[in-house]
A protein has these predicted regions:
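A generic, lipid-embedded transmembrane alpha helix
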Residues: 39-56, 78, 106-111
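N-terminal signal-anchor/start-transfer transmembrane helix
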Residues: 5-27, 143, 147
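Hydrophobic alpha-helical segments and helix pairs
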Residues: 79-131
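Juxtamembrane boundary at the C-terminal end of a transmembrane helix
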Residues: 253-261
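Interfacial loop-to-transmembrane junctions
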Residues: 228-249
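Hydrophobic transmembrane alpha-helical segments in integral membrane proteins
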Residues: 1-14, 133-141, 261
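A mid-sequence, solvent-exposed acidic-amphipathic segment
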Residues: 157-199
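Cytoplasmic-side transmembrane-helix entry/capping segments in multi-pass membrane proteins
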Residues: 32-41, 69, 91-104, 239-246
Length: 261
């Protein structure tokens, strides 16, 4: 359990170090900016691997895995491959937040959920699918929101010549295209989450379920307006930040605010 906990902490530190990487690389400090990130990511992956040793022992003894445990094993493999790819593809940092977020989510489920809850989720496939889809959707939408803030910041600083162009910085058009793909992916995933969640709301009409449905739908509208505005109206800057932040706040209230009810 402690290995998994420290692995999650180092994954979070790695996520925090990805944003300054772009700024540091623009100032010619590419090696210095990569080293702290790589060390924290390496520590997270090693601790993640160690936390899976009991699962590997279960596999050797012929025991079956739960879906959560399989996801944890898959995520550490993906995280290791994506991190090593940083040395070959300079723009791989764009994918890493999604990879590390998936690792964090899988570790939380595999380590901290009680066996009773895991057994209940395994028996209810639709509920398990909905929860997994919801968590992944939130991760994608959250990363997309951080990405639009980073894009606006980079665009403004380049125009004001506060930072210099660098080979480590991808073209703004490429960054914007990647951002829009990620944002659109979040909107599609949120649509699927709302569709799958409708079934559970109809099965059990409770205040908590209605709270999640209403705020998730409002977030879907906010993200949808942002996507349409960027795609058809060419929105950039403040408008995109306002709608993106509004969407993630509404989604956060919908996903976690119901705990206060």
């Amino acid at each position: 359990m402690w290995f998994a906990l420290f692995s999650i902490i180092f994954y979070i530190l790695s996520l925090l170090l990805i944003a300054p990487f772009l700024m540091n690389s623009s100032e010619g400090k590419l090696s210095q900016s990569k080293i702290p990130f790589f060390l924290t990511a390496l520590a997270a992956i090693i601790l993640h691997v160690v936390s899976t040793f009991p699962l590997l022992e279960d596999l050797a003894s012929g025991q079956s895995f739960t879906l959560m445990q399989i996801a944890s094993l898959m995520s550490v493999i993906i995280a290791a491959l994506a991190t090593l790819s940083m040395f070959l593809v300079s723009t791989m940092w764009f994918v890493l937040p999604i990879v590390y977020a998936f690792s964090i989510i899988s570790l939380i489920f595999a380590t901290f959920l009680s066996s009773h809850i895991i057994q209940m989720l395994n028996q209810n496939t639709l509920m398990l699918f909905h929860i997994g889809l919801s968590l992944f959707t939130y991760a994608v939408c959250f990363i997309a929101t951080l990405y639009v803030i980073q894009l606006v910041w980079l665009d403004r600083n380049l125009k004001k010549r506060k930072i210099q162009f660098s080979p480590a910085i991808p073209p703004l058009m490429a960054i914007e295209r990647h951002f829009f793909c990620l944002f659109a992916m979040g909107e599609v995933l949120l649509t699927l989450t709302l569709i799958s969640g409708t079934y559970h709301v109809l099965q059990a009409v409770t205040l908590e379920n209605l709270h999640k449905a209403i705020f998730s739908f409002l977030a879907w509208i906010s993200f949808g307006i942002a996507c349409f505005g960027h795609w058809r109206l060419g929105w950039r800057g403040k408008r995109m930040i306002i709608y993106a932040i509004s969407g993630i706040i509404l989604l956060t209230i919908g996903y976690f605010g119901s705990r206060l009810i």
